[in-house]
Every structure is written in structure tokens, then in C-alpha cells.
């Protein structure tokens, strides 16, 4: 007996899992790491809770030029940008701005550009 449904033997693959993984990583980074960074750099150091010598120019440059520091700075800039541009892309669709592939390319190109600039600027240190 033949089944009453068709199975597509060559389904069209979606690129959405790639964008969703960057979206998820950016959202997680923005929710967990960014508030701590803002707390330390924007509140605790200016209030004197953390000694300002801990963030002297020489120490910050040595951190930024280390592999862990460089990856931290790149992730701090790039991952939230991928998250934001994914939200912009899907937000435009929700607001009935159907830009199609051009809108998708524009949104993800901006995120890619910011990511590339973060890497370039880190290597310029």
C-alpha cells in the first residue's frame, strides 16, 4: 500500500540555524556579560570601589593584546551586534516591511562589518 503523502527526498536547506546560533550567543552574552562589564567599568571603578590602578593604561593594553582579552573585546562588540541585527531583520518582517533577501543581506552585512572591524582594531593594537 502506498502512503497518502509525499516525502521530499531533497528538501531545501535553510541558513536560519546559522543566524539563530549567532542570535542566541549574542543575546546570552548581552544578558550575562554586558551588565557585569557596565557595573565594573561604569559604576564600581568611578565610585572607587575598585582601585583605578587596576585599570591603568598599561594593564588595559596588556589585557587587550592578550588572546583572552582580544577574544573578550571582539565578543563584546560582535555577538550583541549579531543579536541586534537579527532582531532588526525579523522586526522589519513583523512590521510588514518585506525587504526580502536584500534586507537580510543588509542586516547581516552590518553585523559582519562590525565584527570584522572589531577584529581589525584588535590587531591594530
UniProtKB/Swiss-Prot annotation:
SUPFAM superfamilies: Fumarate reductase respiratory complex transmembrane subunits (SSF81343). GO terms for cellular component: fumarate reductase complex; plasma membrane. The chain crosses the membrane at residues 30-50, 60-80, 105-125. Disulfide bonds: none annotated. It is found in: Cell inner membrane. It is a multi-pass membrane protein. Gene3D superfamilies: Fumarate reductase/succinate dehydrogenase, transmembrane subunit. Keywords: Cell inner membrane, Cell membrane, Membrane, Transmembrane, Transmembrane helix. CDD domains: QFR_TypeD_subunitD. Its main location: membrane. One of its GO terms (molecular function) is succinate dehydrogenase activity. One of its GO terms (biological process) is fumarate metabolic process. NCBIfam families: PRK05470.1-1. Belongs to the FrdD family. Anchors the catalytic components of the fumarate reductase complex to the cell membrane, binds quinones. Part of an enzyme complex containing four subunits: a flavoprotein (FrdA), an iron-sulfur protein (FrdB), and two hydrophobic anchor proteins (FrdC and FrdD). This is Fumarate reductase subunit D. It comes from Vibrio vulnificus (strain CMCP6).
Amino acid at each position: 500500500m502506498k502512503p497518502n503523502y509525499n516525502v521530499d527526498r531533497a528538501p531545501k536547506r535553510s541558513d536560519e540555524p546559522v543566524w539563530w546560533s549567532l542570535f542566541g550567543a549574542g543575546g546570552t552574552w548581552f544578558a550575562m556579560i554586558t551588565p557585569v562589564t557596565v557595573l565594573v567599568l561604569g559604576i564600581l571603578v568611578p565610585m572607587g570601589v575598585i582601585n583605578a590602578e587596576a585599570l591603568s593604561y598599561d594593564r588595559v593594553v596588556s589585557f587587550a593584546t592578550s588572546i583572552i582579552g582580544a577574544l573578550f573585546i571582539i565578543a563584546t562588540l560582535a555577538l550583541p551586534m549579531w543579536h541586534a541585527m537579527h532582531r532588526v531583520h525579523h522586526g522589519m518582517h513583523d512590521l510588514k516591511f518585506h525587504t526580502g533577501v536584500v534586507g537580510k543581506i543588509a542586516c547581516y552585512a552590518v553585523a559582519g562589518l562590525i565584527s570584522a572591524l572589531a577584529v581589525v582594531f584588535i590587531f591594530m593594537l
